[in-house]
Amino acid sequence: MSKAKNVEEFIAAQRAAIAANPDCGNSHYNLAVALIGLQKYDEAEKALKEAIHCSPTLAEAYVQLGGICLQRGDLDGCLAYNQQAIQSRAGFAEGWGNIGFVQLQKGEIDKAIEALEKATKWNPNFIQAYATLANAYLMKGMVDKSIDVNLKVLQLEPSFALAHNNLAIAYLEKGEYEMAAEHCAKAVELGYEVAPEILKEVDEHKK
């Protein structure tokens, strides 16, 4: 059986569950996630709003709505939905991580750092939040903190290529060219597309 057919059958099952029990927030949510997988964002948005109507504390539904906003280029909408997510569930790391990501995209670096630090506090294994936090520190000029956080990422996931790339950039800023070259090479080895200017700068400082 094809994956597409499996998804369509899952969607049909969720619609049947909703018909039998329209007030089940989880059924609306599951339907929405499947529709997002098919890139049917308008239908998914409607299902997510139904999920929230049935289950106002379903934090994941707010996050998914934020994701749809992001898909449409609506940063403010994404931020608003993720703020609702953290209000609906205390300590919801994913919501804080998304807030930090959006604030960084908006150039609000201090706010982004605050949100991302909360995300990693609530989920000490939240790799993507650590990676975004490391980038925020680097943008703020806090190079040593950025290095420390990227190294934390590599403790959690040694093959996380973005962390190697970001370490290469941070070590270049510190003038530690051998370390920069080592992490640049590792990022390339892992398939990351390192920026040409970084590759050039690393190459210029090779002995």
Regions flagged by a language model, labelled:
Residues G25-N26, A59-E60, A93-E94, I127-Q128, ...:
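Helix-start (N-cap) detector for alpha-helical repeat units in TPR-like alpha-solenoids
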Residues N125-E189, E193:
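Ankyrin-repeat and related helical/solenoid repeat scaffolds used for protein-protein interactions
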Residues N26-G37, E60-G67, Q71:
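Non-membrane alpha-helical segments in proteins
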Residues S2-A16, L38-E50, Q71-Q84, Q105-K118, ...:
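Structural signature of tandem alpha-helical TPR/SEL1-like repeats
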Residues S2, I169-E173, E193-K207:
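TPR/TPR-like alpha-solenoid helical repeat scaffolds
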